[in-house]
Amino acid sequence: MSQKTNENVERYTQFLQKPQKPIQPYICSTLNDFQEERDFLANNIFPQLNELCNSWGTYFKAVDLSWSALKAPKSLPTHLFRQYSCLRSQRLKLCLDYVNSCFPFFICMLGQTYGDFLPDYSHFMTSKVTRLSSLSKVENLYVAAKNGYPWVLENPSCSLTEFEIIQAAFLNESQFQYFYFRTGTTLLKALDDEKKGERLPSSSSTNEEETLRIGKLKAKIISKGLPVRFYSDLHELGELVFKDWSVVIEKLHPATLMIENIDYKHSFERFYHEEFTEKCKQMCVISKESDRTFEILEKFALKDVELDFNNVAADSSLDSVPRFFRINPTPTYKSILLLSREHGCGKSTLIANWVNYFKKKHPSMLLIPHFVGSTCESSYIMSVIHYFITELQYRNYGTQLETDILNEDSDGLVFSFLVEVFIASISLKPCILVLDGIEELIGIYGISGQKVKDFSWLPHSLSPHCKFIMSTVSSSLSYKSLCARPDVRTVELISTGDEETKLNIFRKHLSIPMMDPFEQSTQALRKKPDLSPLKLTILANELKEYRINHNEFQCMKEYLEAVSVQELWELVLKRWIEDYSWTFQPKRANSDTVASGEGLDSWVADALCLLCLSHGGLAEDELLQLLDMLGYRNHYKVTALHWAAFRNATKQWVQEKPNGLLYFWHQSLSAVEHKLLGVITPVESSPCSFQTPMNHKKTHFHQVLIRYFQRQTSFWRVYQELPWHMKMSGCLRGLCGFLSSPTITDFISKIQSLGFWTRLHLIHFWNVLLEAGYDVSEAYLLSVAKIKADQCHTMRKSGTLSVLQCRLIELTVLDKCRLMFFIGSFLKFMGKTNEAEELFLSVEDMLVQSQSMTDMLLKVQNAIGELYLETGMTQEGFQYFQKAWSSMLRLSLSDLEDSRDLVKQKVRVLDNLAKSASEEYLKENHILEYATEISNLLDNNPRDQATMKYIEGVLMFVAGNTSLAKMKLRECLNIRKSLFGKKNMLVGEVMEFLADLLFFPQRDSKKSQRKQVLKYYKQVIKIKENAETLAKSSLLRKQLSISLSDTLCKLAGHLLASDSCHHVMIEAVGYLYRSVDLRVIHLGSSHSSIHGIHGILHLLREIEWIRSRRYWPQGMSQQHSEGSRNGFSLWEHLVKLNYHSAQSSNTVSSAMCMNADKLHRARRMDLAPQTISDKSKCAPGKGKKKPIICISAEEKIQRKTQNNAEIWNGSGKEASKKKTDYSSNILSLGKMNGLIKLSRQRILLAKSESGEGEITTIYHHPLPWPVSTKNPGESEFISEKWLFHSPDYISISQKSFLQRRLHIETKLLKTSNDINKE
C-alpha cells in the first residue's frame, strides 16, 4: 500500500493504543473584573478547542466556578438561605478542591486588582468560630484548613485568587499552566454598586496595599519562570489562549488522528475499562489477604494444571486458607475461576488491582479485563462477547479495532454465531479473560436475562489456551449455575481481613490530614465488626462532607445504625438533598404523565433520577439544561457553582467517563431507583414498564429526556439516548419515525465502518417495533419516496438546528443513491428481500443514467448479484457480477493503493465470480492473474486473506492444478475456522468445496480421506440446518433447504461409494429420503429436480435387493457368494446417477467440472512431488471399484435428444450424495418409519399440487463412455449447482412410481424389523 495509507494506519493504530484523557483547565481570576473575559472565552475560544480535542478522541472543558453568579442573601428566597450559607462557608475549600482535580491544567487572568483579603489578621480567631455558615467569604479559610488545606492558616492575609495560584503553581509544578496579564489602567467592565458593596471597607491605604500585593504576586509568577502572556483586548486574549492550548492538545496527543466517519465505540469502551481500573487502583488498600488472593489468581492464570494449595503461600497451610477464602478442591482441570463475595465487599477493586499487578509483572501475557456496569454498553452480553472477540483478534492479527471482521458480516449479530466466534478467538493463543460483576449482565436482541446469567450459552469445555476469571455475588443465579460446571474452581472471599485493614480502608477514603477527632471515629467503627469495604468507603466520604455543616459524631452514629447498604444509601441521599438542594412551588398540573399531587422532591433528586434513567450517562451541561426544563430557573436556578459543590461532595459515586458523561460508579446506587423513583424492577428489565401505574414518575422523566434530546445537535448523543427513551416510555410511533427518517439514515449511512454497538441497537429497536406491529419496509420506503421527490431540502446551518430539525439540502444523485443503498441493505438484513432488490435495481438505474461510474456502482452491482446468488438465482447473479467486473476494470490498480474499501470491493467481486462463473469465463478473462495482483494489495485483515485463498483455490482448480487448489482451500478453511468457529456459512462453503474435491476423484482414496469427506459433509449439513433456522427471509430459507438437499445427496452418495454394509445403507437411505422431502416441500412437483425422485428410488430398490439377499436364511455364505455381484450392481446404478442441482447455472464454485483432457492434465499434475497422490481419484467399495461419471451442463444440453432412452439409468444419485448428515441415529427404526411416512406424504402432496397424474422425470444422460474399472481416473468433477438439473423431460406413470416407492419402503421396513428381532 502507499506511504500515505501506511502513515494513516500507523497514526490510527497509535490512537487506538493510547487512552485520550480530557483537558480540563481551572479558570482563575479575581471575581468581579474578569467576567467579560470569562464569557468571551466560554462562548468563542473554548468551543474551538473542544472541537480540536474531539478530532483526537477526547474533549476540552474549562472549569469556571463563577462565584460572581452567587447572589447575596437578601435576594434569595427564605428557603434557599441555608444552601447559600453552606456554599458560602466552603468557598475556599471548594476552589482548592477543583484546582487539585483539574491539575495539571490551569489558566489564570490577572489585572490591576488583587481580590478580597484580610488586611489585619489579628481579628480572626478560629477558636471562637461556632457556626461555619456564619463565616464571611474570606474567613471561611478555617473550613479549608480543617478539611485538607492547613497551610492556608500560615498565609491568612492572601486573597482567594492567590490561594488558588499557590495551590496550582507553587505547591505543585506543571508545564500546562498559563498566565494572562491584562495591560492598561482601566477595567474592561465596570463594577456595579452591589458588587462593590460586598468588598471589605475601602480606604486609600487599602487600595495602596492591594496594588502592592498584586504587583508582588505578578513578580513571583514571572520570577518562577511560569509562562506569562500580555493582552490588551478580548480578541488578543482569544488568540493567545487558542494558540497556547492548541499546543497543549498536540503535545499530549502527538501523531494521533481520528479518521472521519468511523464509529469509535469500541475504542472508547476500551478506555473506559482502563479508566475504571485506574480509579480502583487509587482506592485499593493492600493487605495480607489481598496479597494472597493475588497469588491464587496469578497461579491459576499461569498454570495449566491444578494449583498446589499447600504452596499458595510460603508460610501458609491449608488450615489457614478458610480464614480468608474457601476453595473448591476438585482435582480436575479447571478453566474458570469464580471469585465470589456479597455486594460491597470490594471484588471489583481487588480484581482491578490484580489486573494492574499482573500486567506489570507479566507484560507479555495476553490479559483482557472487562468490568460489567462501567458503561451502559458493558452490561449487554453481546457487547461483552464482542469486546473480547475484538481485543483477541486485534492482539492476534493486528486488525483495526473499529473495522473488525464482525462488522462485515451480519452473522456477527446473531448470538449463537457470536459465541462461536468467541470460542474460536480464545483458541488462537494463550489468553486470560477477566469478567467482573457477571450478575449485572443483561440480555438484548432476543436473549433473555436468565439465559445470559445462567451461562448456558457457554460451552461445557473451553480451550486449554484460555483462563477465564469471573466475579459475582454468592446469591446470584450466575454463581449457582457456574458452580455446577466441572471446569469451575470457586474462591469465596469470606472476610475483609483484620481490624487494622478495615481502619486503613476508612483512612484511605477519609484522606484528611491532622484530623484530631479521628480516634473517636475509629472507636465507633470498632464496635461494628461486620462493616464491608463499601460501607467503610461511604462512611469516610460522607464524614468529610457532613462534618462541614453538621456534627460529625451524630453523623457517624446515624449512619452506623443502618442495617443494609440500601438503608445507608437512603440516609446519604437524604443528606445530599438537605445540604445541596431545594425545590420550587409552581404547580405541575400540565404534566400529562405525572399523577395528580405527585411532585418532584428537589433538584438533586431530579438530577439523580435523570442520571439513573439515562442510557449512557449525561454531561454536566446536559443535566443543568434538563433541570432548567423541569422548572429550576430564575431564583431557583441551579448554577454551575451549586452543581460544582454537589459534584465535589459526590465525586466518589457520580464519576465522569473519559468522554465527559457522568455515571454511577457503583451498582449499589440503584437505591436511587428504589428510593426516588419508587421502582423495584431495574430500568433495563422491561420496555413496557411505562404501562405500570406506579412507574408514572419514571415515565415522566423518560419523556422529559425525549423532549430534551429532540432539540440537540450532536448526532451521536441523540442516537445513543433518544431511541432508548422512546422505547422505555412507549413512544413507538416516534421511535419508528426517528429510525426511518432521511436525516438519521443520512448520518448512519455516512459512517464508513458501522460499529457493532450501533448496528446492534438499530436492529434491537426495529425488533421492538416489529413486535408491536410496525412494518420496517413500509417505514423506510416512505423515506425513499421523500428522498426521490427531493422533499428534504431545508437549509441547515451548523450548530443552529437540532438533529431532528436538520433536512438534507440539495441532494445529489450520489447522495440519494447512498441513502437508498443503505436502506436496501438494511431491509435485506431484516428479511425484506423483494424490497431490497427493488431498491438496489433503482439505485443502479440512477447511477447508470447519471453516468456516475464510481466505486458505488461497483458496490451496488455486487450487492444485487449477491442477493440473487443467495436466493438461488445464480444466472442472474452472475450477470451482475459480470457488470461489477466491468466496473472494476475501469478502476486502475493505482486507484486502489489509497482506498482499502475499494480493495475489499474487488475481493468481493472476485469471490462472487469464483462462485458463479463458468470455467470458460474465468479463463477467458484471466481472473487468476488479476486475483494475484489484488492479493498483493491486501492488508493483514485475516478475513480478506482467507477469501483470497478461497478465490485462488477455485481458480487454480479451474487451471487444472488440483493439488495446489486443495492446499489453498485448506489454508482458507483453517483461517476461517480460527475467525468464525465451526458453524459459520463461510466455513461451510469452503468445507463443502474441499469435500467435493476429495470425494469425486475416488480412485484408491485412503480411508482417512474418506473419513475426512464424511466429516466435512456432516458438518456442512449442520451449518446449513442452523443457518436455515436463523434466516429471516423465506427466499433465503428456501434456498438453504435446497442447498441442504444437495449436500444430503452428496453424503448419501459418499456413503454408498465407500461401503455397502447394512448400517451404511440404512443411513444413506435416510439421507436420500430427506433430500426428496426438502425438494418436494420447497420446489413443488413441477420443478425439474423433483423428477429425480424416480432415479433415487430406482437406486433404493437396488439397495433393498442387496440387503434382502444379504439377510437370507443361509446367512453369510449366501452373502459372500453374492458379494461381487452386489458391489457391481450397486455401482452400476450409482455411477449412472448424475449429480444435479436445482440451479440452472454453469458454475464451478463449490464443486468441479472438467472434461477428460482437463482431468488428464490434473492427473499428471497430481503425480508431481508437491501434489496429492492420485489414489484419491477412485471410490472404493465392496466389489469392483467404479468411477463416478459426470458431465458438464454444456454437454448435457448438446445431448438433449439422447436423454429419453436413458432416463432410468440414474437421476438422483448425486442428489443422494448431498443428503450428507441427516443423523447418525437414522439407524433407529422409529425414526426411519417417521421419515418414510413423511416422504410418502410429501410425494402425495406434490401429486395433488401438480394437478397431474404423472411426474415428469428429467434425469439421466447417457454416459460419455462405457463404465469400466479399467478407466478409474476418467471421471469428471461437476458443480454442486448442477445437482438435480437436466434439460430433458420424460413422463412416467405417477401411479407406478408410487407403487414402486411403497414397495421399496415396505421391504425396507420389513428388513429392519427382521434385523431388530435378531
UniProtKB/Swiss-Prot annotation:
It is found in: Cytoplasm. SUPFAM superfamilies: P-loop containing nucleoside triphosphate hydrolases. Keywords: Cytoplasm, Repeat, TPR repeat. TPR repeats lie at residues 399-432, 653-684, 817-850, 858-891, 991-1027, 1045-1082. InterPro entries: DCAF12, P-loop_NTPase, TPR-like_helical_dom_sf. The keyword Hydrolase does not apply. One of its GO terms (cellular component) is cytoplasm. The keyword Nucleus does not apply. It comes from the Eukaryota. Its main location: cytoplasm. This is Putative tetratricopeptide repeat protein 41.
